[in-house]
């Protein structure tokens, strides 16, 4: 016989819900550990009174009845385990595993039998159903009725609220059967009543969740939170764990109680009670027990009078009454010298405490993570430029908890702690293959041809060439633009009306005023607009003839291996993919080229073609009017078009400058120069009739030039098509 049996996927019944966990059976005890809450229940071998097997839906299970009258039910065993389990129970606990027969006739009348803390409703010798009395929260009697109310489990999708029993009156009975039924139920029911004297009372205790100040009254089986608005009664057996944690500034203490089931405030459930204490607050309480009761009932763990800081006194009383040890922060010490690591969880800031067997976060919302729940941890966003990092915890059920904004100084301490606890870190360099299976993961491979990328590069080169041509035009037209030479700082500072003076002086009639100045301003604005439009048109015209003329004698460029292969397989691609678009052939060919393993034939041919190109280029001499000459000639012609005339340069050598709109013919230039030499005048005269005629002639000649350019470009396109 084996010393123990262990099952990893067994369900235990907890208030109408089957909770999964691990069951271990040894000669000394039966241990069940809840997977979700981590709560451990132990049944000593000496306390076992009866063990039966029972059929459940789709499986079978065990009924373990203790001498104290408590019933435990475990389900999820395979049929093949029945014989093996029966032999182990007989050898370890000296019990015969007899099957419990159930009545399935559907009758709703029978006999109520009380066995320990279980109400069994039987018909003849078979059980119809069983009610654990520890699940009963209230029992109310009527004339011939008894109503049982039950504690609710939030994890249960459907719960039993109440059950009514009709008990017929018996005249010959000495006792009323209704009262007797009520007494049997109440003797074993988990009814919370605040009758009797409390063991200890703590006044005005600050609680962070649920927020408020409450008076805490501690009784033997439960404790009560009494606030201004809400009142809670919490059974001692619903407390899973106790935590005593110091605040980061060491001026406060957190006392945390983990609850299952949680308390409810409206629709909000609180799985943790977070109490906040000041370390310097002290109290003294006297327990209402004699020395003999303290020694017999609590094994001498409590004294008659307890004094000290409030959190220590409450923690000591809770620890003994609940029967759970208090968990501290452990050996971890952070950069701040305390066990707390400042961080943010979800939308609120709080503190993360690395414990000996898990993590706990306080306080909004509180969260406890056990090591056995953790799949991996990750240090995220911890680059050199950032001053903080994120700590991600991934659970085995797929849930990810992210603690963000942790100071960079905590990284080394936290990493050493993770290494010491042997937790799996997911970003150590081995797991950086996140994009391996993505289709676009190898798109940056320069050895593979990409038709779309080549087209984009060609367009970018053409655009750069056009931009260079445009920039040279703009630079050449703006060579004479010297605004600082046209203004007089002294005149602007000391003249009362600089613009009106200059306008009056330049007016031939000599009758300038406010209205005349406004008109001239409008004329100048319109002239500036015309100038901008003209520049824009000139830029468009200069871009058109930028096309290069091909040199027919220039050697043909070398063809790549991909293009050689594509030219040979183009027809086969069309046959295999009927109806394929011309634009899709290159894309399909690129995919086939990537899958092609043996490319040596095409690569050798491409190498020969490349050598041929280099040899021909060595002996090649450009023809007159070829690419290089055309290119230079095109740019020089553009510069000649926009090059300023000598008369303009002579005009700009004075105290001010003149733009194109104000340049007149030779007759008016001398008069303008004389006027420019006068120190009080800063702006030139409006354009004369001669200027207008000159502009008209120039504008008529420009369309002719553009037509010639367009004809030349059309001829180039025809040459390219013929090639």
Swiss-Prot record:
<keyword id="KW-0238">DNA-binding</keyword>
<dbReference type="InterPro" id="IPR009071">
    <property type="entry name" value="HMG_box_dom"/>
</dbReference>
<comment type="subunit">
    <text>Component of the FACT complex, a stable heterodimer of dre4/spt16 and Ssrp. Interacts with CHD1 and TRL/GAGA.</text>
</comment>
<protein>
    <recommendedName>
        <fullName>FACT complex subunit Ssrp1</fullName>
    </recommendedName>
</protein>
<feature type="modified residue" description="Phosphoserine">
    <location>
        <position position="671"/>
    </location>
</feature>
<dbReference type="InterPro" id="IPR038167">
    <property type="entry name" value="SSRP1_sf"/>
</dbReference>
<feature type="compositionally biased region" description="Acidic residues">
    <location>
        <begin position="702"/>
        <end position="723"/>
    </location>
</feature>
<dbReference type="GO" id="GO:0030838">
    <property type="term" value="P:positive regulation of actin filament polymerization"/>
</dbReference>
<dbReference type="Pfam" id="PF21103">
    <property type="entry name" value="PH1_SSRP1-like"/>
</dbReference>
<dbReference type="GO" id="GO:0006281">
    <property type="term" value="P:DNA repair"/>
</dbReference>
<feature type="compositionally biased region" description="Acidic residues">
    <location>
        <begin position="464"/>
        <end position="478"/>
    </location>
</feature>
<dbReference type="GO" id="GO:0042393">
    <property type="term" value="F:histone binding"/>
</dbReference>
<feature type="compositionally biased region" description="Polar residues">
    <location>
        <begin position="644"/>
        <end position="656"/>
    </location>
</feature>
<feature type="modified residue" description="Phosphoserine">
    <location>
        <position position="670"/>
    </location>
</feature>
<dbReference type="GO" id="GO:0001933">
    <property type="term" value="P:negative regulation of protein phosphorylation"/>
</dbReference>
<comment type="similarity">
    <text>Belongs to the SSRP1 family.</text>
</comment>
<feature type="modified residue" description="Phosphoserine">
    <location>
        <position position="443"/>
    </location>
</feature>
<dbReference type="InterPro" id="IPR036910">
    <property type="entry name" value="HMG_box_dom_sf"/>
</dbReference>
<feature type="modified residue" description="Phosphothreonine">
    <location>
        <position position="669"/>
    </location>
</feature>
<feature type="modified residue" description="Phosphoserine">
    <location>
        <position position="628"/>
    </location>
</feature>
<dbReference type="GO" id="GO:0005730">
    <property type="term" value="C:nucleolus"/>
</dbReference>
<keyword id="KW-0227">DNA damage</keyword>
<feature type="modified residue" description="Phosphoserine">
    <location>
        <position position="668"/>
    </location>
</feature>
<keyword id="KW-0234">DNA repair</keyword>
<dbReference type="GO" id="GO:0031492">
    <property type="term" value="F:nucleosomal DNA binding"/>
</dbReference>
<dbReference type="Pfam" id="PF00505">
    <property type="entry name" value="HMG_box"/>
</dbReference>
<keyword id="KW-0804">Transcription</keyword>
<dbReference type="Pfam" id="PF17292">
    <property type="entry name" value="POB3_N"/>
</dbReference>
<dbReference type="InterPro" id="IPR048993">
    <property type="entry name" value="SSRP1-like_PH1"/>
</dbReference>
<dbReference type="Pfam" id="PF03531">
    <property type="entry name" value="SSrecog"/>
</dbReference>
<feature type="compositionally biased region" description="Basic and acidic residues">
    <location>
        <begin position="677"/>
        <end position="692"/>
    </location>
</feature>
<keyword id="KW-0235">DNA replication</keyword>
<dbReference type="InterPro" id="IPR011993">
    <property type="entry name" value="PH-like_dom_sf"/>
</dbReference>
<keyword id="KW-0805">Transcription regulation</keyword>
<dbReference type="InterPro" id="IPR000969">
    <property type="entry name" value="SSRP1/POB3"/>
</dbReference>
<keyword id="KW-0158">Chromosome</keyword>
<feature type="compositionally biased region" description="Acidic residues">
    <location>
        <begin position="486"/>
        <end position="507"/>
    </location>
</feature>
<dbReference type="GO" id="GO:0070087">
    <property type="term" value="F:chromo shadow domain binding"/>
</dbReference>
<keyword id="KW-0694">RNA-binding</keyword>
<dbReference type="GO" id="GO:0046982">
    <property type="term" value="F:protein heterodimerization activity"/>
</dbReference>
<dbReference type="GO" id="GO:0031491">
    <property type="term" value="F:nucleosome binding"/>
</dbReference>
<feature type="DNA-binding region" description="HMG box">
    <location>
        <begin position="555"/>
        <end position="621"/>
    </location>
</feature>
């Amino acid at each position: 016989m084996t010393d123990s049996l262990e099952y990893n996927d067994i369900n235990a019944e907890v208030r109408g819900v089957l909770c999964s966990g691990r069951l271990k059976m040894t000669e000394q005890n039966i241990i069940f550990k809840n997977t979700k809450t981590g709560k451990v229940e132990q049944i000593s071998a000496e306390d076992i009174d009866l063990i039966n097997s029972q059929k459940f839906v789709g499986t079978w299970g065990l009924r373990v009845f203790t001498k104290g009258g408590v019933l435990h039910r475990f389900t999820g065993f395979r049929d093949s385990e029945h014989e093996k389990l029966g032999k182990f129970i007989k050898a370890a606990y000296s019990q015969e595993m007899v099957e419990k027969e159930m009545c399935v006739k559907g009758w709703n009348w029978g006999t109520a039998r009380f066995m320990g803390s279980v109400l069994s409703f039987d018909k003849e010798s078979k059980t119809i159903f069983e009610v654990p009395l520890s699940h009963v929260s209230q029992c109310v009697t009527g004339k011939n009725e008894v109503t049982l109310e039950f504690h609710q489990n939030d994890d249960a999708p459907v719960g039993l609220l109440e059950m009514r029993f009709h008990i017929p009156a018996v005249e010959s009975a000495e006792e009323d059967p209704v009262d007797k039924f009520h007494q049997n139920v109440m003797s074993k029911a988990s009814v919370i009543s605040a009758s009797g004297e409390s063991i200890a009372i703590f006044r005005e205790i600050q609680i962070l969740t649920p927020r408020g100040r409450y008076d805490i009254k501690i009784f033997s089986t439960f404790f009560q939170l009494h606030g201004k608005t809400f009142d809670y009664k919490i059974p001692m057996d619903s407390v899973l764990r106790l935590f005593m944690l110091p605040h980061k500034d060491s001026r406060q203490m957190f006392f945390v109680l983990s609850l299952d089931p949680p308390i409810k405030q409206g629709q909000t459930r609180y799985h943790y009670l977070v109490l906040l204490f000041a370390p310097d607050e002290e109290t003294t309480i006297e327990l209402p027990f004699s020395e003999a009761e303290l020694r017999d009932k609590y094994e001498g763990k409590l004294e008659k009078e307890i004094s000290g800081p409030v959190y220590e006194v409450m923690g000591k009383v809770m620890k003994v009454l609940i029967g759970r040890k208090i968990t501290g922060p452990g050996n971890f010490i952070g950069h701040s010298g305390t066990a707390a690591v400042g961080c943010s969880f979800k939308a609120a800031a709080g503190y993360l405490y690395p414990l000996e067997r898990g993590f706990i976060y306080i306080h909004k919302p509180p969260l406890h993570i056990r090591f056995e729940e953790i799949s991996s941890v990750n240090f995220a966003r911890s680059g050199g430029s950032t001053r903080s990092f994120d700590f991600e915890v991934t659970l085995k059920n797929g849930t990810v908890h992210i603690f963000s904004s942790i100071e960079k100084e905590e990284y080394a301490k936290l990493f050493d702690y993770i290494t010491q606890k042997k937790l799996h870190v997911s970003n150590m360099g081995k797991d950086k293959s996140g994009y391996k299976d993505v289709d676009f993961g190898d798109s940056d491979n320069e050895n593979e041809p990409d038709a779309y990328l080549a087209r984009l590069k060609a367009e970018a080169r053409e655009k750069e060439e056009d931009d260079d041509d445009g920039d040279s035009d703009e630079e050449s037209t703006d060579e004479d633009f010297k605004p600082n030479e046209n203004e007089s700082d002294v005149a602007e500072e000391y003249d009362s009306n600089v613009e009106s003076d200059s306008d009056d002086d330049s007016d031939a009639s000599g009758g300038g005023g406010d209205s005349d100045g406004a008109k001239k301003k409008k004329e100048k604005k319109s002239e500036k607009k015309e100038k901008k439009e003209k520049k824009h048109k000139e830029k468009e015209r200069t871009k058109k003839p930028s096309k290069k003329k091909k040199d027919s004698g220039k050697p043909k460029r070398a063809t790549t291996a991909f293009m050689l292969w594509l030219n040979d397989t183009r027809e086969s691609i069309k046959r295999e993919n009927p109806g394929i678009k011309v634009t899709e052939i290159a894309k399909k060919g690129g995919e086939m080229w990537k899958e092609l393993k043996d490319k040596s034939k095409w690569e050798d041919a491409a190498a020969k073609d490349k050598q041929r190109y280099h040899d021909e280029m060595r002996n090649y001499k450009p023809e007159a009017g070829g690419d290089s000459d055309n290119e230079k000639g095109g740019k020089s012609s553009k510069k000649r078009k926009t090059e300023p005339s000598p008369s303009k340069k002579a005009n700009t050598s004075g105290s001010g400058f003149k733009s194109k709109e104000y340049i007149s013919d030779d007759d008016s230039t001398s008069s303008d120069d004389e006027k420019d030499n006068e120190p009080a005048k800063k702006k030139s005269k409006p354009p004369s009739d001669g200027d207008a005629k000159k502009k008209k002639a120039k504008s008529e000649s420009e369309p002719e030039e553009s037509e010639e350019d367009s004809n030349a470009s059309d001829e180039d396109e025809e040459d390219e098509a013929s090639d």
